[in-house]
Amino acid sequence: MIKKIKELGQIIYLARKKNIPMRKKLMLYLCTMVMAGLGIVCLLLVLTRNLFGTHKQIQDVLQMQLDSSTAQMQEDLEQYTGYGLSLSGQISQNIDNQLKNNAKKLTDYNDDQEALIELQRQIYPEMNTTIQICRPSGVYAVLDATVNTKISGSEKSRSGLYLRLKNVTNTGNLMAETILFRGSPDIAREKELELHNRWNLEFNTDVMPGYHTLVDEKKRKGMSYFWSEKTSLTGTWEDVMFLCVPIIGNSGDIYGQCGVELNSMYFNQNYTAVDSKYGSMVTILAPVSDQILEVQKGMTGSTDGTWLQSVEDLKINHKKYYNEYFSGQGEFIGLQKEIQIPGEKENRWVVAVLLPKDKWQASVWRNRN
């Protein structure tokens, strides 16, 4: 195109050198302008086609990763839900048998340390089997009884067991090493478990997601389980999500709550950042509300190669090929897909795959040059 314009320039120059009538000169100028305009239009069409082609390529890359991450997330959560429901059934059966043999109710175990330790012994095998087989970062059971009702704050203190993996990243061992986060030190000694450095004897139900909902039949409203939003694990630097399942006896009595814990290390390990020619793609599981991706309430996979902060929500701007996500730290592009997660609140959850906008822009310009 540039060569043609140069040729037209030479023709105009020669026309000036010769005595060509004004009318022919005007026609020549007009043809030159038309040709130049057509050249510019063609150039813009080429650039636009390349740009749209790039957007479509990015959309395809994001969509492929989103489909993969969503399928994995759905499968993982369904698997842990199944194990949690099974654990609840096994624990309730153990408690039913224990109470029947002793002709007692669970409330009779208040202030009876030995009886509560025996209950923990009874439920330990099922809990240990669950954490060894499905390998969440933790498994827990809160029982609606306390070792001492006479101390201050006893109304929010509850007995139970809480086992955690000592090393979430070491999933290759046949038998994972576990530590005791909540429960009697007698259990730790008998099972040769190390006490967590933030160990406590009992649970604080005020900071245990879902407990006050699940043990209250009116509040529970028939919920068989739900997943919590991200919460800080008391006394640690870790963020976690809990599967919350009520423990219900044959008579319909509520014995407490159990489930699994998935911590931030679990998500980093299982949802790694994926490299692409447009930058690192990050997987996020989070609620969406009013065009806001509520990252602070969800969990984030590995953020290697990005500056994504899990403490800041992202505003969503829906575009033709992909979405734009904004925060005070910067911008991302990505796609999201709704996923069915029962929650204590009626949140709409999505799996999102994002990559830094500046990284893909740099990649596009680099490939053009």
Label for each model-derived stretch:
Residues S92, Y124-C134, K219, T234-G235, ...:
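Short regulatory alpha-helical segment in sensory/regulatory domains of signaling proteins that mediates
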Residues I20-E118, R135:
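Juxtamembrane extracytoplasmic/periplasmic/luminal helical "stalk" adjacent to the first N-terminal
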Residues L180-G259:
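Extracytoplasmic/periplasmic ligand-binding sensor regions of membrane-associated signaling proteins
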Residues M1-R23:
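Non-catalytic regulatory/interaction regions at protein termini and inter-domain linkers
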Residues L143-L195, P287-D290:
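GAF sensory/regulatory domain recognition
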Residues Q122-E126, Q257-M299:
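Solvent-exposed, extracytoplasmic
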Residues E238-M241, I248-S251, G256-F267, S302-R368:
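Extracellular/periplasmic juxtamembrane segments that couple receptor/chemosensory ectodomains to their
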Residues L26-L30, V364-N369:
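N-terminal membrane-entry
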